[in-house]
């Protein structure tokens, strides 16, 4: 079998608050790379503090791609991400640099590296109609509707998973075929790069939970609520009938802050809900990552040497990297 001649890339994966951003920036500086963000919140303009978006200094230190692609009232699909990510990777390689994919959105990683089954594109009007229907009858009723239309998909989608219920119904209403049909169709071509997958994950869950809580408190101190107030004040956001169903507002932390500003509970309760929602997100991310059988796992604080050796061996170089911090 011929050797794989595709250019090399590194994927820095892991649950939220595990230190991916810091490691990706450090690796890019050390090995000559550019960062491709793999995060479904960072594609939205205005989601900065609450999404831990790399700041101006970080972007000045290392080129970043796929940030601020859409306004918060717009929709951005995994298929769009796959196309944009592959374009970015090709451009980075053409410049003689190493693409470093970094983030925590598993669907985006899969779309960029493995391809997605061909599926109807998102239709904002259909999504809004489904959201309006959910306001009337509830998402549980829409999940029951999905079970009648597509029992295979309904069995895989939890009755409280609004985003996936909405997408499954949207696909059916657009195409007349259930989403499970589309998911069995052949995926796109493989990625134009050969990837080393690195998973950053503290071995002790308590460590990750502490990082999550600490990061949220820092975000609140840095003005997260003011950021959400500014989003709410945008005329285009005020015109949306069900803003809580927008993908941008569904981002962890933003929903809880939005509901607090709507008058639901105290700030302390909102903070605790956001911490809990972020823990649940981290749990889902870890579950998905365990299915990445070709990924190599590292504790960001304990496995310094092994992480360095993995990168150096993959890239054919032997150099040291500075200790990444939790970002």
Curated annotation (Swiss-Prot):
SUPFAM superfamilies: P-loop containing nucleoside triphosphate hydrolases. It comes from the Bacteria. Pfam families: IPPT (PF01715). Its cofactor is Mg(2+). GO terms for molecular function: ATP binding; tRNA dimethylallyltransferase activity. The record marks 105, 127 as: Interaction with substrate tRNA. InterPro entries: Dimethylallyltransferase, IPT, P-loop_NTPase. Keywords: ATP-binding, Magnesium, Nucleotide-binding, Transferase, tRNA processing. Substrate binds at residues 16-21. GO terms for biological process: tRNA modification. Gene3D superfamilies: 1.10.20.140, P-loop containing nucleotide triphosphate hydrolases (3.40.50.300). Residues 39-42, 163-167 are annotated as: Interaction with substrate tRNA. It is an enzyme of class 2 (transferase). Belongs to the IPP transferase family. Monomer. Catalyzes the transfer of a dimethylallyl group onto the adenine at position 37 in tRNAs that read codons beginning with uridine, leading to the formation of N6-(dimethylallyl)adenosine (i(6)A). PANTHER family: TRNA DIMETHYLALLYLTRANSFERASE. HAMAP family: IPP_trans (MF_00185). This is tRNA dimethylallyltransferase. It comes from Xanthomonas campestris pv. campestris (strain B100). The gene is miaA.
